[in-house]
């Protein structure tokens, strides 16, 4: 993991100048309600592109393209780029800015109301590369990870604390960790300071890469049962698994004790201490014989 050196509020002059020119030309402003912080660091941009490992045959979905700094580089490298943007003024500006590129398309829509299948229009492999607005990060991650048409790779900019949860190891894992690791293999690319954006956010961000294999990581595990158990286990984090599962599942402690014994898990442990393999075993045992 790398951390960029702190940047001045102006960031990289060339990208900052481009941002100001575009904002003035189209009478744009960063809308706080939409969590808009525009990327102005060439170094951070390069790290995103390196992690995305784009090829001329790739299809890329970008959520919240902002002023198009990342979009422009995606267009140069990928075969097709589909951006999804809610801000109508940005849609107008980006449509004009990239009108000469036949491999670019922008959809004016709320990403949370638009499925990956609807965006793509066909069943093809794709990558998600995006600087995600903080306020919808978890919802967007769930939407793409749980979709029937999952990306083969996700490279996303998220709040630093969210990134830490996404890549957490056994002992520190939470529900978000399990949600990501159920489908893919996450890794932290780089921590990004607030000065890499305009206007700068109050917290640091981070780039996270999630590789999603074609073959399911949790082969043979019921998705519904897995997340039912996970939500119950993490519903009351300070409680032991015995108490948390009994309360979360609405069953007796005796039933949960029998379940944990069959899975070979100590009832006094807490949810965050379980490894992915232990969650898998717990789920398999539960599916075979529910409490």
From Swiss-Prot:
Keywords in alphabetical order: Cytoplasm, Methyltransferase, RNA-binding, rRNA processing, S-adenosyl-L-methionine, Transferase
Main location: cytoplasm
Gene Ontology MF terms: 16S rRNA (adenine(1518)-N(6)/adenine(1519)-N(6))-dimethyltransferase activity; RNA binding
Subcellular localization, as worded in the UniProt entry: Cytoplasm
One GO location term (cellular component): cytosol
Annotated binding of S-adenosyl-L-methionine, by residue: 37, 39, 64, 85, 110, 131
EC code: 2.1.1.182
Reactions performed catalytically: adenosine(1518)/adenosine(1519) in 16S rRNA + 4 S-adenosyl-L-methionine = N(6)-dimethyladenosine(1518)/N(6)-dimethyladenosine(1519) in 16S rRNA + 4 S-adenosyl-L-homocysteine + 4 H(+)
UniProt similarity note: Belongs to the class I-like SAM-binding methyltransferase superfamily. rRNA adenine N(6)-methyltransferase family. RsmA subfamily.
UniProt-listed HAMAP family: 16SrRNA_methyltr_A
Function recorded in the entry: Specifically dimethylates two adjacent adenosines (A1518 and A1519) in the loop of a conserved hairpin near the 3'-end of 16S rRNA in the 30S particle. May play a critical role in biogenesis of 30S subunits.
Protein name, per record: Ribosomal RNA small subunit methyltransferase A
Organism: Dehalococcoides mccartyi (strain ATCC BAA-2266 / KCTC 15142 / 195)
């Amino acid at each position: 993991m790398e951390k960029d050196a702190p940047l001045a509020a102006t960031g990289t002059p060339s990208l900052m100048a481009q941002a100001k020119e575009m904002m003035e030309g189209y009478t744009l402003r960063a809308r706080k309600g939409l969590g808009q912080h525009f990327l102005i660091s060439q170094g951070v941009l390069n790290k995103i592109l390196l992690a995305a490992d784009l090829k001329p045959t790739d299809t890329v979905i970008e959520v919240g393209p902002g002023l198009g700094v990342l979009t422009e580089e995606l267009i140069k490298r990928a075969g097709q780029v589909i951006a999804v943007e809610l801000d109508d003024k940005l849609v107008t500006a980006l449509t004009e800015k990239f009108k000469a590129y036949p491999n670019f398309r922008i959809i004016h829509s709320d990403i949370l109301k638009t499925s990956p299948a609807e965006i793509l229009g066909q069943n093809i492999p794709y990558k998600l590369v995006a600087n995600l607005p903080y306020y919808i990060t978890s919802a967007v991650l769930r939407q793409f990870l749980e979709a029937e048409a999952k990306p083969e790779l996700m490279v996303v900019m998220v709040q630093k604390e969210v990134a830490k949860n996404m890549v957490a190891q056994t002992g520190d894992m939470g529900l978000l960790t399990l949600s990501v690791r159920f489908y893919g293999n996450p890794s932290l690319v780089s921590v990004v300071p607030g000065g890499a954006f305009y206007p700068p956010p109050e917290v640091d961000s981070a780039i996270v890469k999630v590789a999603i294999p074609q073959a399911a990581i949790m082969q043979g595990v019921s998705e519904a049962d897995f997340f039912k158990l996970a939500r119950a286990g993490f519903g009351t984090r300070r409680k032991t698994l015995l108490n948390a599962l009994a309360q979360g599942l609405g069953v007796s402690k005796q039933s949960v004790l029998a379940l944990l014994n069959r899975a070979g898990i100590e009832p006094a442990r807490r949810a965050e201490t379980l490894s992915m393999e232990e969650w898998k075993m717990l789920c398999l045992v539960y599916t075979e014989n529910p409490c």
